[in-house]
Amino acid sequence: YKIICLSNYFGKESGILAGLDNSEGEAIIIMDPDLEDPPELIKDLIKKWKEGYDVVYATRKKVQLPFYKSILKKIFYLVFKIFTKQGFNIPSNTGDYRIIDKKIKNILISMRERIRFLRGLISYIGFKQTGILFDRPIRKKGKSKTSISWLIRYGMDSLLSSTGAPVSVITRIGLFS
């Protein structure tokens, strides 16, 4: 394994990209560093990948979110689906925890957008994908540091990096008002 130390916090997506840039294996596991998603699931992800899937994502059976986060999540995915129309099929209750094949990694690192939404890009790229269900354990320590403002900013960045439709709509409204 390899440890990559960044000089500063550049965001989750940039951290994942740094890991992808420096990975050398035939498959790469992507997971959040807080270990809320159980590392024990890695063997199941690898098993499915060995069955011939290019992407195997981990899907939470049940998601326990505060009410406001649940509402924001539903709004984001509804708006995302409306604006992106075809090409994106992001499974519900699926975060970044997954295994991707080397060919997926190579495509992702060739896409050098400054702002990226990896879940969306991986969905958009296609190839053979499947998910495995798991129970996410209740957080043992601490609280999520994810604020409402961060969620909204991340949602807007994700949407704008995936489609130009919102900019087009805003431009048209501006021209005709």
Enumerate the predicted regions with their spans.
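Histidine/lysine/aspartate-rich catalytic loop segments that bind and position anionic ligands
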Residues: 127-129, 135-138
